[in-house]
A protein has these predicted regions:
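Non-catalytic, membrane-anchoring transmembrane segments at the edges
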Residues: 1-197
Length: 197
């Protein structure tokens, strides 16, 4: 059985930053998930485990200011995006999570959940992958993802001789300052919405 190193289409036309991070380098993702994330999640909690995983990834990719800034930004971005989309998916009972669902979700619990399930049975076609509003929401999140990737990708200027060894932290911050930290502000807004939900 041949295993892929990456799933290029999911990196080039992404649904979410989570999907990009997972599909960019499958062997490294599997290793980091098994040996860093899962090992630390029970002791530190999911948020700290995500950041520890990105720290390990930074070390494996070469500890430069440029790589560290981009990967730690990705860590924060993916955590916020995953959390926000999970909350929205649960509230709307829709397939708008950061990763595609293998099968429809099953809701259990209180009478309110039972009533929501009844309403959702009536409106089921509106909540699945193929419905127009779910496609629209996922498309908007996909466009936001492409914006973040372009912003983070500005750090990797192939025309400079310094790129081979990696830029310093100060250089990376000056590039982002020139862009008014636009992507970081956008993620801050999403983090606030996530916190309010």
């Amino acid at each position: 059985m041949r295993r892929s190193l990456s799933l290029a289409i999911l990196s080039q036309v992404p649904r979410s930053l989570v999907e990009v991070v997972v599909s960019w380098n499958l062997p490294m993702h599997r290793w980091l998930k098994v040996y860093v994330f899962k090992q630390s999640r029970s002791r530190l909690g999911p948020g700290a485990a995500v950041m520890l995983t990105y720290l390990a990834s930074t070390v494996l990719h070469g500890l430069t200011g440029q790589i560290a800034a981009v990967l730690f930004s990705l860590g924060a971005y993916t955590w916020v995006e995953h959390s926000l989309r999970a909350k929205l998916s649960n509230i709307m009972d829709a397939s708008i999570g950061a990763r595609r669902e293998a099968e429809p979700r099953k809701r259990v619990g209180s009478i309110t959940d039972h009533l929501m399930k009844t309403v959702n049975i009536i409106l089921m076609s509106q909540h699945r992958e193929g419905s127009s509003w779910v496609i629209l929401v996922n498309l908007v999140f996909g466009l936001v993802t492409m914006f973040h990737l372009a912003y983070l990708g500005v750090m990797f200027d192939q025309s400079s001789p310094d790129q081979a060894t990696g830029y310093s932290w100060a250089h990376t911050m000056s590039k982002w300052r020139d862009l008014d930290y636009t992507s970081h502000w956008a993620m801050g807004i999403l983090a606030t919405v996530n916190w309010l939900l």
